[in-house]
Swiss-Prot record:
Disulfide bonds: C70-C82, C83-C94, C111-C206, C180-C198
Domain called C-type lectin: residue spans: 90-207
Extracellular compartment residues: 45-213
Ranges annotated as spanning the membrane: 22-44
Protein name from the UniProt record: C-type lectin domain family 4 member C
Species this protein is from: Homo sapiens
Lineage: Eukaryota, Metazoa, Chordata, Craniata, Vertebrata
Main localisation: membrane
C-alpha cells in the first residue's frame, strides 16, 4: 500500500513545478528578445556598412567631379548609377563633349584628368546617341588613332578594332599621314568618321564608365 502524500509535500511539488514552468517561459522570452535584437542589428549593420562604402566611393570620385547626377537602377532602391554633372548617360557609360579645341594628345590628356578616355564607339546605337549632342559645324576627336601610319587603327582603351563596326565616311580613311580620327557631319552622308592630322585642334568627346553606388 502506497502511503498517502502529505499536503505539505504536494504543495512543495506544485510550487517546484510552477517554478520550472515560469523559468522556461522567462528563458524563452529572453531567447526571443535576443533573436529579435540580432535580426534588427544585422540589417542595420549591413546598411551602415553599405553607406560607409558609398561615401568612400563618392569621396574617391570627388577629386575628379565635385557633383554627380544619380538615378535609381531597376527596382532596388539601394542601387544607383551616377554620372558627373553635366555629363550625359547612355547604357553603362557617361559622356562629356568639350567646347574647347585641342590637339588629339591634349584632348586625351584632358579626358584622362577627369578619369575618362576619348570616346570609344562600339555600336551603331551608341553613335546614334552621341551625335544627338553634337553640332554639325564642329568636328570631334575620337579615341581612335593610327600611331604608326600603317592603317593599324587602335582604340585608346585597347578595345580591339573591328572593321565591321566602323562608321567611316565614304573613301575614308585616305591619308597615311592623318593618324587620328574625328567624327563630323557631311551634308551628303550626315555623320561619319574621318582621318585627320593629330595636331590640328578639334573639339572632343570623353567617355567613362558609370559610377555605381
Amino acid at each position: 500500500m502506497v502511503p498517502e502524500e502529505e499536503p505539505q509535500d504536494r504543495e512543495k511539488g506544485l510550487w517546484w513545478f510552477q517554478l520550472k514552468v515560469w523559468s522556461m517561459a522567462v528563458v524563452s522570452i529572453l531567447l526571443l528578445s535576443v533573436c529579435f535584437t540580432v535580426s534588427s542589428v544585422v540589417p542595420h549593420n549591413f546598411m551602415y556598412s553599405k553607406t560607409v562604402k558609398r561615401l568612400s566611393k563618392l569621396r574617391e570620385y570627388q577629386q575628379y567631379h565635385p557633383s554627380l547626377t544619380c538615378v535609381m537602377e531597376g527596382k532596388d532602391i539601394e542601387d544607383w548609377s551616377c554620372c558627373p554633372t553635366p555629363w550625359t548617360s547612355f547604357q553603362s557609360s557617361c559622356y562629356f563633349i568639350s567646347t574647347g579645341m585641342q590637339s588629339w594628345t591634349k584632348s586625351q590628356k584632358n579626358c584622362s584628368v577627369m578619369g575618362a578616355d576619348l570616346v570609344v564607339i562600339n555600336t551603331r546605337e551608341e553613335q546614334d546617341f552621341i551625335i544627338q549632342n553634337l553640332k554639325r559645324n564642329s568636328s570631334y576627336f575620337l579615341g581612335l588613332s593610327d600611331p604608326g601610319g600603317r592603317r593599324h587603327w587602335q582604340w585608346v582603351d585597347q578595345t580591339p578594332y573591328n572593321e565591321n563596326v566602323t562608321f567611316w565616311h565614304s573613301g575614308e580613311p585616305n591619308n597615311l599621314d592623318e593618324r587620328c580620327a574625328i567624327i563630323n557631319f557631311r551634308s551628303s552622308e550626315e555623320w561619319g568618321w574621318n582621318d585627320i592630322h593629330c595636331h590640328v585642334p578639334q573639339k572632343s568627346i570623353c567617355k567613362m564608365k558609370k559610377i555605381y553606388i
